[in-house]
From Swiss-Prot:
Listed InterPro entries: AB_hydrolase_fold (IPR029058), Esterase-like (IPR000801), S-formylglutathione_hydrol (IPR014186)
GO terms classed as biological process: formaldehyde catabolic process
Pfam families given in the database record: Esterase
Active site residues according to the UniProt entry: 145, 221, 254
Cellular component, GO, one term: cytosol
Lineage start: Bacteria, Pseudomonadati, Pseudomonadota, Gammaproteobacteria, Enterobacterales
tRNA-binding keyword on record: no
Enzyme class per UniProt: hydrolase
Superkingdom as given in the UniProt entry: Bacteria
Natural source organism: Escherichia coli O139:H28 (strain E24377A / ETEC)
Signal peptide as annotated in the record: none
UniProt name for this protein: S-formylglutathione hydrolase FrmB
EC number, UniProt record: 3.1.2.12
Reaction(s) the record says it catalyses: S-formylglutathione + H2O = formate + glutathione + H(+)
Amino acid sequence: MELIEKHASFGGWQNVYRHYSQSLKCEMNVGVYLPPKAANEKLPVLYWLSGLTCNEQNFITKSGMQRYAAEHNIIVVAPDTSPRGSHVADADRYDLGQGAGFYLNATQAPWNEHYKMYDYIRNELPDLVMQHFPATTRKSISGHSMGGLGALVLALRNPDEYVSVSAFSPIVSPSQVPWGQQAFAAYLGENKDAWLDYDPVSLISQGQRVAEIMVDQGLSDDFYAEQLRTPNLEKICQEMNIKTLIRYHEGYDHSYYFVSSFIGEHIAYHANKLNMR
């Protein structure tokens, strides 16, 4: 992994690395925050998945998470949201193609050549982190919007791999809303059964489980009713007896002003779980 940015932050280092991804067949950037204690010991890892239009920079520059990661001794890994490059398929819209990988494995041309973000996040990236950084095997996952969707899907499908999961403003029923429907049709085809593998509410209804889900949702979020539908997740978790910590916040929108307001509580939540034995 090639170090391309290095910034001192709260006694640790906010770095950005570039590497070639075998899963995605392109060069990828990834942000890695190494707290002060990483200089002397192995630490657990929180993976952060960003939302539509984002890259590895949004979370590391806008959330203020470094203060809390340093306090709680957690490495934070923030990858890009899709494969990148002139040779990678793209679309002339913000919600499909580069910047909109949806954390799935595409099966349809031309997307299936590079869009294997599920494999990248689940397998390739953790292997690289273990190889190059002072990381323990204990990891958690979180994300925002499309990234919140990805975090929920990865945790629900691999409950033994992630200690805990949380999300900000996640797309909880992508097969039922425009963002998910158009992306799934392009990436996965018209067979809607395939869509359900990447739909958190559907996965829970099929019996997939995690110990607990933490979600924060702003009530002044322009996408709340049409695209996100957090109450769908709350309802299915109640029906399936999955413990939740779902909080609704008056006045907060879909932006990083919202994420930065509560990221400290999410990192504390994950730290508590990651440090349990």
